[in-house]
């Protein structure tokens, strides 16, 4: 069992990152039933018209959102992945507030136990990301490419956040308005963007 982990060795100031596609792919290999059930739930909610042809970019974006939703918003039973095939097949999706742990955290904890490249710093980043991340719709109050930051207002839950995201800040530089759907988390004392805006 191995997965790709993007750590920021070239910049120790940035947190470690685990790609949500890798999380979904690992669960697809270790417990296809959990992966398939989550996929059915997600696509039922998305409710795409099967008779309509969608552009490839739309379908890719929906798939990216599935990876994020599965990794961060689903919950699985027990302690998560163990590396023991028969144990991992017993994992089930959990429902309700506070039930289980996220697939993201399950894989992060597994990697911390099994992969010497994942140390104390990385697992702390993963746990903090898992604790603080949330997805919402945000109104862009300000974007500065120079600062590499966005100031966004959560229009669903309320609150204003300053988010470090060089790519999005460059893309929306100078914007004082406009809406994005994004996932943000507070890791290492800084709000950061954790999905594709």
Task: Locate each region found by the language model.
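Mixed-charge, low-complexity intrinsically disordered regions
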Residues: 1-137, 142-147, 167-197
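OB-fold (S1/OB) nucleic-acid-binding surfaces
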Residues: 141-162
């Amino acid at each position: 069992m191995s997965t790709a982990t993007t750590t920021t060795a070239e910049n120790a100031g940035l947190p470690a990152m685990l790609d949500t596609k890798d999380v979904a792919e690992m669960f697809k290999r270790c417990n296809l039933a959990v992966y398939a059930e989550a996929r059915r739930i997600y696509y039922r909610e998305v409710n795409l018209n099967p008779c309509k042809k969608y552009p490839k970019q739309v379908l890719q974006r929906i798939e990216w959102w599935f990876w994020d939703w599965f990794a961060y918003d689903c919950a699985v039973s027990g302690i998560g992945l163990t590396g023991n095939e028969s144990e991992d097949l017993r994992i089930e999706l959990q429902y309700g507030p506070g039930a289980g742990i996220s697939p993201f955290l399950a894989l992060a904890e597994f990697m911390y136990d099994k992969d010497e490249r994942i140390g104390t710093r990385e697992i702390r980043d993963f746990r903090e990301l898992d604790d603080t991340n949330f997805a919402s719709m945000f109104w862009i109050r300000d974007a500065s490419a120079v600062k590499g930051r966005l100031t966004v207002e959560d229009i669903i839950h309320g609150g204003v956040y300053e988010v470090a995201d060089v790519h999005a800040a460059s893309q929306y530089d100078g914007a004082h308005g406009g809406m994005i759907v994004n996932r943000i988390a507070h890791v290492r004392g800084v709000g950061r963007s954790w999905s594709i805006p």
